Structure formats: C-alpha cells, structure tokens
C-alpha cells in the first residue's frame, strides 16, 4: 500500500510511466484519479480535490468518496486484472457520476494501475428520473382514460327486437375505434361504428367528441344522412389540421317497421347483412369527416329487415390484419367465416385474426353484431 506522497512525487511518477500529460489532467473539468493494484489513489487531479474538499492521494479509493468498505463491484480491480476498460455509475455526495476505468501500463507493458475518469451526469440522471416519474403519471392517466373509454361502450344487450354483441380490442392503451347504440325515440334505435385516424390520446379524444356529438344530434335529427351532415358541421368548427379525420357508418333501425336506414362517411369497411339464406354488403358512397371540404352532403339508403337478419359492423383493423408475408385478412375472409359459421361469428372472426396476424397487433379493431331477434 502506498503512503500519501507530495505532488512533486506524483508528477514524477506520471512522467516516469508516461501516463498522461499532467497539465492536461489538471485542467480537465472531469474528475481524474489513478489507483494502484492495492486500491490506493496515487494521483488525483485538481478538479477532484477541490470538489471533494481534500487531498485524496494516499487514501483507499472507496474511502475518498465516503464509503466504509470496498465496492461490491470494483471496476479498478477488474480493469487491472483483465486489462479491460470498465464503466459504471456512482453516486457521490448526492451527485451522479459515470465512472470509466482504463488500465495503465508501464514501459514493459505490465498493467500496474487504473486511471479513472468521473464525469458528472447528475443533470442527465435527474432529467431521466423526472421523465420516469412523468411517464408513470402518464401511464396512470392513460389507464384511467382507458377504463373510461371501455365503460362508455354500449352494453351487450337486447334492445326490444334487436340484440347487440361485440368484440373490442385496441392496439394501444387507448383506441381510435368507437361504436355506440342508443334509443333515438320510441320507434328508432341508432347504431354507428367509427374509426379515427391514428392511435393514442388524440384519437381517443376524437372518439369522445363523436360519441357526445352523436348523442346530442339524435335529439333533433333522425335521418342518418342529415345526422352525418350535422356531425360534419360541428366537426369543422374544431378547426383541426387536415390530417385529423375519421370515418363513420351510421344506421337507424325502426323497431316497428323493421326499416333500416343508413349513411356512410368514408367508412371503407362495409357492413355485412346476412341471414341463413343470403349475404350482402350495405354499400353506399360518402366522404370521410375531413376538413378538405367546405361542405359534405351524404346519401341515404334503406333496407327492410326481418327476424333472423344480422348486420356485422367492423373496422379496418380486421380486414387489414397482415400475416407473415404481408397478406391482409380481407373482407373475403370475413365473408367465408360467415358462410361456414352461422353461430359465434364474432369469436370465430377474432380467433382467425389471431391466427392470421404476424407480430404485434398494429391497429385497433372492433366487431359489432346487430341481430333482429323478434
């Protein structure tokens, strides 16, 4: 073990072993020290001494920054014994340091000490810790928002002469897919499915806007086409960028006449109407809800439903699910499942999507089934 020696001796040893230019070391903003094989500090630069408020030369390396026993993982010992450059992080007097230990050799090439450079990374670590805490809070808030989004989904229930069932699976914590079923008046029941561009918080907030606005409009307007035109008018007042848009398919079922009127605002996942004998798609044109247009008028069609008729609503997370080769699931696959499985359609489609898909789920998806039961 080396005894504490004066600075002149240290300078002499530095020059003797050709370690590093002394004046360069003394002028560095980082802490620099040289530790021998016994763990004794044989050199410390001015910055380190001034920061610690003492001359640490001659001290055991761990004692120089307040420890009572050697570190469980000693990078100095590792560096000297293996000749490797080793790095770890230390907390000294409340500050964080990235410490890098490099082997030092003499003129014969033998490792006899390690030079350690302490770089103060306190600011970076505090920012990281703050970011971690903020992320924790954000995750907690997102979890709360997710529960709210799930709770406002309609019940899987019977509404007079129709029954509603669905499967809802967001790709992230929050979804851009939304659907709803509600009474309009004593005769009419409204049902829609929508798909907001993007994912996450912004998309989820848009689904809230759609839900609240649709439930507000229904008190004054029954017609699906007029409802979508009014929805677009209110959407345009938000003054959003053109990359913020959504699609929506909206239908109104009259429980007395069994007439189903519907309109489409760019929802390219055309609902499928089927029963034991036939299957057809409810195709109708219509632009999505986007501020690319000053005004949009929507078409309206109607069909007559009967007991046993079913309408399957879905979003593009179904048809655009891709396998390993990039092949999409497609509407054809959905229709084949309907043809071969008259019962438990939602579960069959969901199971097939899981089997078909490769990797993580890339998009939200929703499946909603409306069935005329009497």
Language model regions located:
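Conserved hydrophobic beta-strand signature of PAS-family and PAS-like sensory domains
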Residues: 41-42, 262
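Sensory modules in modular signal-transduction proteins
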Residues: 11-38, 46
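Sensory coupling linkers of modular signal transduction proteins
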Residues: 2-11, 105-135, 319
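… and, occasionally, acidic/histidine-rich disordered N-termini of signaling adaptors
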Residues: 130-312, 359-374
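Active-site-proximal, acidic helix/loop segment immediately C-terminal to a metal-coordinating Asp/Glu
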Residues: 202-220, 305, 309-358
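Terminal output helix/cap of sensory domains in signal transduction proteins
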Residues: 59, 63-93, 349-355
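Conserved acidic
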Residues: 3, 120, 195, 316, ...
């Amino acid at each position: 073990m080396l005894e504490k020696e004066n600075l002149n001796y240290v300078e002499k040893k530095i020059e003797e072993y050709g370690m590093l230019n002394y004046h360069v070391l003394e002028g560095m903003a980082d802490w620099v020290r040289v530790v021998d094989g016994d763990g004794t500090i044989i050199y410390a630069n001015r910055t380190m001494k001034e920061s610690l408020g003492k001359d640490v030369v001659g001290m055991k390396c761990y004692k120089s920054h307040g420890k009572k026993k050697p570190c469980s993982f000693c990078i100095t010992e590792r560096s000297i014994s293996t000749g490797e450059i080793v790095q770890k992080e230390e907390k000294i007097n409340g500050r964080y340091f990235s410490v890098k230990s490099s082997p030092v050799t003499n003129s014969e090439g033998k490792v006899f000490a390690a030079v350690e450079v302490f770089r103060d990374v306190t600011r970076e670590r505090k920012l990281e810790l703050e970011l971690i805490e903020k992320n924790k809070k954000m995750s907690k808030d997102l979890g709360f928002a997710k529960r709210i989004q799930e709770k406002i989904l309609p019940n899987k229930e019977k509404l007079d002469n129709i029954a509603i069932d669905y499967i809802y699976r967001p790709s992230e914590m929050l979804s851009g897919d939304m659907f709803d079923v509600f009474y309009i008046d004593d005769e009419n029941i409204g049902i829609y499915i929508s798909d907001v561009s993007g994912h996450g918080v912004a998309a989820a907030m848009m689904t809230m806007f759609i839900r609240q606005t649709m439930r507000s409009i229904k008190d004054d307007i029954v017609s699906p086409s007029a409802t979508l035109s009014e929805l677009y008018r209110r959407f345009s007042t938000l003054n959003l960028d053109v990359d913020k848009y959504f699609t929506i398919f909206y239908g109104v079922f009259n429980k007395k006449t069994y007439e189903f009127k519907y309109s489409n605002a760019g929802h390219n996942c055309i609902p499928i109407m089927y029963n034991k004998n036939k299957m057809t798609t409810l195709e109708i044109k219509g632009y999505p809800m986007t501020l690319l247009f000053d005004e949009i008028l929507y078409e309206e069609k109607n069909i007559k439903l009967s007991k046993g008729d079913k309408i399957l609503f879905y979003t593009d997370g179904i048809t655009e699910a891709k396998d390993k080769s990039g092949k999409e699931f497609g509407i054809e696959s959905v229709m084949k499942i309907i043809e071969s499985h008259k019962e438990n359609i939602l579960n069959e489609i969901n199971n097939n999507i899981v089997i078909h898909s490769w990797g993580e789920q890339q998009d939200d998806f929703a499946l909603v089934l409306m069935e005329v039961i009497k």
